[in-house]
A protein has these predicted regions:
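Serine-dependent carboxylesterase/thioesterase catalytic core
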Residues: 2, 9, 13-17, 26-116, ...
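Short alpha-helix in the alpha/beta-hydrolase fold that links the catalytic acid
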Residues: 3, 129-136
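Catalytic histidine-centered segment of alpha/beta-hydrolase-like enzymes
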Residues: 26, 149-158
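Post-His helix in hydrolase/transferase enzymes
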Residues: 30, 155-168
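Short, hydrophobic alpha-helical segments
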Residues: 37, 163-175
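Acidic catalytic loop of the alpha/beta-hydrolase fold
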Residues: 122-128, 151
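Catalytic histidine neighborhood in serine/cysteine hydrolases
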Residues: 138-153
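Alpha/beta-hydrolase-fold serine-hydrolase catalytic core, especially in secreted/extracellular enzymes
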Residues: 173-196
Length: 196
């Protein structure tokens, strides 16, 4: 079971990010994700769910297209703090992506996106520093601790159940009613084994 299946089983209309294997930020990443959002957007704002680097992309996308984004949920994403020290895989990322982690190939927005944001983080992550995934109070609307390792956030059933439930609770809190799940799409950008 993975995060997309867990969301679909809970009634969400789920759409993968459609960019294949995530090899880091590229000059056209946000443009391609913007097009993907346009394909999914049908007049109802879209919930963006992103794991690890995918969560950082989701936040950037929300900065650029807030009128199309319902909320952003990040799963163990290192969006806060010093990008040089907030993850144990910085050197690997830089080799794979071909650029310094602090110099992505597109301008990076600062601060919290202008939409509701929910951050999932774990003390046991092992890849991303807990404080980097939790964020500061001015960077996120709600931060929820999950008891899992980094990959467990998108694969481990107890974590998946908790994440789906917390997303629904969060949306109920900000919208004043339980989410009409079928009325919203979800883009999940994460490391995929094959192109969609």
């Amino acid at each position: 079971m993975d995060i997309r299946r867990a969301l679909a089983r809970a009634g969400w209309r789920v759409h993968p990010w459609g960019l294949g294997l995530n090899r880091g930020a590229k000059p056209d990443t946000l443009e391609l994700l913007g097009r993907r959002l346009d394909e999914i957007y049908d007049g109802r704002r879209v919930l963006l769910v992103g794991w690890s680097l995918g969560g950082m992309f989701a936040r950037e996308l929300a900065h650029r297209h807030p009128q199309k984004v319902r909320a952003v949920a990040t799963l163990c994403s290192p969006f806060s703090g010093d990008y040089k020290t907030n993850t144990n895989v910085r050197e690997l990322y830089e080799r794979v992506a071909g650029h310094d982690v602090n110099e992505p190939p597109f301008p990076r927005a600062s601060g919290k996106p202008p939409v509701p944001t929910l951050a999932f983080w774990s003390r046991r992550d092992g890849i991303v520093a807990p404080s980097a995934a939790r964020g500061r109070g001015d960077e996120v609307d709600c931060a929820v601790e999950i008891d899992t390792y980094h990959v467990g956030a998108v694969l481990w059933r107890p974590a998946l159940s908790r994440i789906v439930g917390e997303i629904e609770t969060f949306l109920t809190g900000i919208e004043g009613r339980p989410p009409v799940r079928k009325a919203c799409g979800v883009v999940v950008g994460h490391f995929e084994n094959k192109p969609d």
